[in-house]
Amino acid sequence: RIGGYFFVDHCTGAVIGETAVIGNRVKMYQGVGLVARSLAAGQALRGQKRHPTIEDRVTIYANATIVGGDTVIGAGSTIGANVFLMQSVPPDSLVLMDDLRVKVTTKQERSVAPIDWQI
């Protein structure tokens, strides 16, 4: 299921798995993968949610990969470029790579220690 006002820019290499759910006003850039985890040998696939859920107003930047049917990206979150994510994140989170580790910060944490954005 894909919600309204879904925006894909530079769609080359984007992969949206069969059971992915994408909310309203989601923006996604090139090379993004919404993919499944490997399942145990012989596990039935029919009727199983294997791909992530992306809630409303999420932005996913280039070459990010979000894995797994239990993974939920909370509304209003931003997933940075080149992030490999196998866990859910709360609404209004910012997810970036930090020294080859995924770093998730909530909106509340960022208001305590604001990030100086220069774009």
Provide a role label for each language-model segment.
Residues L39-A40:
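PLP-dependent aminotransferase-like
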Residues Q43-H51:
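Regulatory activation segment
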Residues K107-I119:
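Terminal amphipathic alpha-helical/low-complexity segments used for targeting or macromolecular assembly
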Residues G3-G4, D9-E18, G23-N24, M28-Q30, ...:
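Left-handed beta-helix
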